[in-house]
Amino acid sequence: MSDVAARLETIRAAHLYRRLRTLSTPQDREVVIDGRRVLLFSSNSYLGLGINAHIRRSAVRALEKFGTGAGGSRLVTGNMTPHMQLESALAAFKGSESALAFTSGYTANMGVISALCHKDTVIFSDALNHASIIDGCRLARGRTVVYAHNDMDDLLEKIRQLRPRQGFIITDGVFSMDGDLARLPELAHIARSYGLTLMVDDAHATGVLGATGRGTLEHFGLSHEDVPVVTGTLSKAIPSEGGFVCGSEILCELLRNTARPFIFTTAPSPAAVAAATAGIGHIAAHPGLVRRLQDNVAYFTGSLAEQGMHVPGQSPIIPIMAGEEEKAVRAAEALLALGVFAPCIRYPTVPRGQARLRLTVMASHTRDDLDHAAVSLRKALAGV
């Protein structure tokens, strides 16, 4: 422990030091941070459902009926009626035969990958995959081969070099720091052609992409035959906490018996599970909310273009590149001074020299909010 102070000083000197900012209000388009009311442009609550009255009442009813905690792992005493209801809702919403809930999206990816991949498995993983996929690959006993981001030629070259007897292609559906989409139809074709299994993390696509918010499969017109393993989270557009995997019943049966993060973790609380189920139901019943989010994304990218910033706008995640860490820190502080909260993203979340402001659009943002954020962003960047 003698080097703790020195390590912290090194972090500060590299402009990588992080501190916690405290929100004293719910996640909405406006929040109070450290005592100041600002526009929120960095939340993953894409549909703004964290304040939805029906969803909150569902959580309260579950709390009153089932108590504050599950009291054990799902395989011992922690499997309650709300957990089974959630998995049924997930399977119906995602169009899969079955589903299995985890305590987080992180543990879902780690559990699924480490359970399915053995010593003879080759995993082909996109270079910009989320840390939970990277850590799941590290836990797995197979060989991990990283291919260049969304580069099908590089992926094919690596597959042809190795010719694995059993292999997985694993990718984010929406890449969390860049906001671009995986080339899923091409990945599905490659997986079929070479006898590989395609796994997609739909954390930032569920409730966001597709005509009804069912994710990347709906967006691209694919099925679970094309993508047999779909993971995701319950803490973004779905306004709760937890994670999931959707697939065949036999897949979920195997994971119930072999996925260590599922077996050795206390089950999610009944209130959180009930909130997730209610959130899924609300999204399914209100596709107009998903369209509103998609319309806001299109409007915001247009507003940014008017301010001289051209971004793809494939998803609600809008990265504005700053480059050096110090510049990103100054830009984020300048933006906050103008009433817009969008923290900078730095190493190790992104590579060194690729620091950025990561803005996210919500369905609850107004056009005035979006215009104000675009103008404020131009001013903040001009000052650094």
UniProtKB/Swiss-Prot annotation:
It catalyses: 6-carboxyhexanoyl-[ACP] + L-alanine + H(+) = (8S)-8-amino-7-oxononanoate + holo-[ACP] + CO2. Pathway: Cofactor biosynthesis; biotin biosynthesis. Substrate binds at residues 18, 130, 349. Its EC number is 2.3.1.47. Gene3D superfamilies: Aspartate Aminotransferase, domain 1 (3.90.1150.10), Type I PLP-dependent aspartate aminotransferase-like (Major domain) (3.40.640.10). InterPro entries: Aminotransferase_I/II_large, AON_synthase_class-II, AONS_Archaea/Proteobacteria, PyrdxlP-dep_Trfase, PyrdxlP-dep_Trfase_major, PyrdxlP-dep_Trfase_small. Its cofactor is pyridoxal 5'-phosphate. One of its GO terms (molecular function) is pyridoxal phosphate binding. It is an enzyme of class 2 (transferase). Belongs to the class-II pyridoxal-phosphate-dependent aminotransferase family. BioF subfamily. Homodimer. This is Putative 8-amino-7-oxononanoate synthase. The lineage of its organism: Bacteria, Pseudomonadati, Thermodesulfobacteriota, Desulfovibrionia, Desulfovibrionales.
